[in-house]
Amino acid sequence: MTRKLFWRTRKKSPSARNLISLALDDVRSILNSADIAKEWAACAPRLSELCQIEDGKTGGVNPGDRRALFYLVRAFRPARMLEIGTHVGASTLHIVAALMRGAWEQIPRLVTVDIEDVNDSPHSCWRQVGLAKSPKQMVEELNARVEITFVTDDSRHFFATTKETFDFIFLDGDHAHETAYEDIVNSLEVINKNGLIVLHDYFPGGRPLWSDGPGLCGPFTAAEKVRATGVATKVIPLGSLPWPTKLGSHVTSLALITKSR
């Protein structure tokens, strides 16, 4: 049924018309921003206190990627943001920290979706891996002036039923290439003008980025399939960050989906 819903709600061919157009130099300028670095330095101690999630132990986004997300969200200042794949809340917390900084005409909104109940179930991942706080508890302790909605649903059904649109979408859900493809296509339908899509676990060519395991093919294959169907997208892998990520490297699996022309 959910697959039928997905196809029924697609009213037209996917288009990159609403995506922002960026170059790698634009992204590097953001990641090397002195102003955002000052904001990061001001909030990083509190984030480390709340987000006591050891890298490599929970499957959560690594510390360097969390910082990169903070920088990207601060730079693009989305009023409405979507995250697919809450998991233990590492990325969620850093997104909220970025959203809460700055002057807003309206309260910014984050919708974060996961197929599991990430907060209250006895089987929630944060409990299973021995963390002290749920994603909801972590973000509540920030006292952020941000509207946050946790949704327990699979991404296909969420996209098929949501009436919302978003300025910035972070995709870190099911990495099977079919689901990742559908997530990208569905994101294109709900992205606002000059919007941005960010992928996690994007391994160019499906090749390993680190020595601790094989590369993941799903997000890369999905993004290539979108382009192969004629959608004018461009993927910008962030490659190496100005700060450490994991295993003593600066390498990241984050990548941006932008308009190619």
Give short role names for the model-derived ranges.
Residues 30, 46, 50, 138, ...:
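Residues that form generic nucleotide/phosphate-binding pockets
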Residues 34-63, 71-75:
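Class I SAM-dependent transferase core
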Residues 1-46, 260:
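Membrane-proximal basic amphipathic "stem/tether" segments
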Residues 55-56, 60, 66-261:
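S-adenosylmethionine/decaboxylated-SAM
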